[in-house]
C-alpha cells in the first residue's frame, strides 16, 4: 500500500511539474523591476537588456505594470525606446487604459494589486541578433498641466516580457 501511495505522489508531482513547465514554454524573456515606495519617478527610466538569437519567428512584446489602489488615473502614458544592436532605435509614446468607466482597475488580481499585461509590439520579428535595450518612463500629467508628474504613486513594479506567438 505504501508503495502505491509513493508512486501516486510521484505521478502527481510529474503532472504538476509538466503543467508548470508547459505554461512557460511561450516565454522568451520576462523581468520585473520593483519601484521603491510604489512610486515611479519621472526622471528615472527603467531599462531591460535582453539577447535576441531568433531573427525569423515573430514574438509578442509586453509592458507589464503592477499597480495598487493608490494609482490615481484611469490611463497611463509611457515613452519607450527600443535600441537595436546595430544602433537603430524605435521611440514610441503610448497610452494604455488602466481602469474602466466606473474606476475599477482592469488588471488581473483579487487584491488591491493588479497585474496589467499590455501589448507593446505584436508579432515583432527582430531584424538582427544581439543585445537589445528596452527603456521606459512614464509621461503622466494632471489635466491642464504641462509638466510631467515628478512622483507617480501606485506603480509597484514595471516589467518587460517577450513571448512566442502561437
PLM region spans:
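Short acidic/polar inter-strand loop motif in beta-rich domains
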Residues: 68-70, 115-120, 124-127, 137-147
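Internal, hydrophobic beta-strand segments that form the core of beta-sheet-rich folds
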Residues: 128-164
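C-terminal motif of bacterial Sec signal peptides marking the signal peptidase cleavage site
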Residues: 19-22
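A short beta-strand element within beta-rich, extracytoplasmic domains
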Residues: 58-69, 132-138
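A beta-strand/beta-hairpin structural motif
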Residues: 96-98, 106-124
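Short coil-to-beta strand junction motifs in C2/discoidin
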Residues: 71-78, 152-156
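Bacterial N-terminal signal peptides that target proteins for export
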Residues: 2-11
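Bacterial signal peptide processing site
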Residues: 24-27
Amino acid at each position: 500500500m505504501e508503495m502505491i501511495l509513493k508512486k501516486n505522489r510521484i505521478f502527481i508531482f510529474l503532472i504538476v511539474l509538466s503543467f508548470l513547465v508547459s505554461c512557460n514554454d511561450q516565454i522568451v524573456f520576462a523581468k520585473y523591476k520593483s519601484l521603491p515606495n510604489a512610486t515611479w519617478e519621472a526622471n528615472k527610466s527603467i531599462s531591460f537588456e535582453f539577447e535576441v538569437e531568433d531573427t525569423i519567428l515573430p514574438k509578442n512584446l509586453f509592458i507589464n505594470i503592477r499597480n495598487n489602489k493608490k494609482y490615481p488615473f484611469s490611463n497611463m502614458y509611457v515613452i519607450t525606446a527600443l535600441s537595436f544592436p546595430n544602433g537603430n532605435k524605435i521611440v514610441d509614446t503610448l497610452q494604455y487604459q488602466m481602469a474602466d468607466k466606473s474606476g475599477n482597475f482592469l488588471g488581473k488580481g483579487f487584491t488591491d494589486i493588479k497585474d496589467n499585461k499590455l501589448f507593446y509590439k505584436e508579432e515583432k520579428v527582430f531584424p538582427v541578433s544581439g543585445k537589445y535595450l528596452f527603456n521606459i518612463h512614464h509621461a503622466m500629467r494632471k489635466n491642464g498641466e504641462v509638466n510631467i508628474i515628478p512622483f507617480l504613486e501606485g506603480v509597484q513594479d514595471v516589467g518587460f516580457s517577450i513571448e512566442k506567438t502561437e
